[in-house]
Amino acid sequence: STDPLTLLANRRQFFVRLEAEIKRAHRHAESLALVMLDLDHFKLVNDAHGHAVGDQVLKAVGVLLSSCVREWDMAARLGGEEFALILPTTDREGAREVAERVRSRILDLRCRTDEGIEVTVSASCGGAILSGAVSNADQLLVAADDALYDAKARGRDRVSMDDTLVGLPKLST
């Protein structure tokens, strides 16, 4: 089912699809990427402009995410201002490129309040790749979430790819 505000997949649908894509990736020996993203300081948007404006921003992000992924990918709203992208047949560099494109386009979003005030937001993104060391949904989620935390810790509005579980250095842009 879908999130009623953004019309993206909801949290439950996301987890069902993630499990299915992991099984498919293992079965066909294909790559799979997960990108988690969080709108930076989103509470300030709601506090300063009200929840109606916050909802307008979330809807715009939903449309943007749908336009940034292929038809076989999945964009989901996990709750609040947290979103995720499931990217089948996508390697580390491909996932980084998608995440960077999303981050950049979110930064370019402009939403106007009824008073004509322009509201902008930024996003932090963390990505992880299914691998020998990251082989199930829990591990993939932890790896992507760790990368998201790293992006936030490095100042927000950036992409971080977590490859520590596969022995590669973190890549942050």
Which residues make up each language-model segment?
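Conserved nucleotide-binding and Mg2+-coordinating catalytic segments in signaling enzymes
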Residues: 1-16, 37-51, 59
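Short catalytic/binding micro-motifs of nucleotide second-messenger systems
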Residues: 24, 67-72, 104-116, 129, ...
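Residue-level recognition of strand-loop junctions within catalytic nucleotide-signaling folds
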Residues: 47, 87-90, 107, 130-131
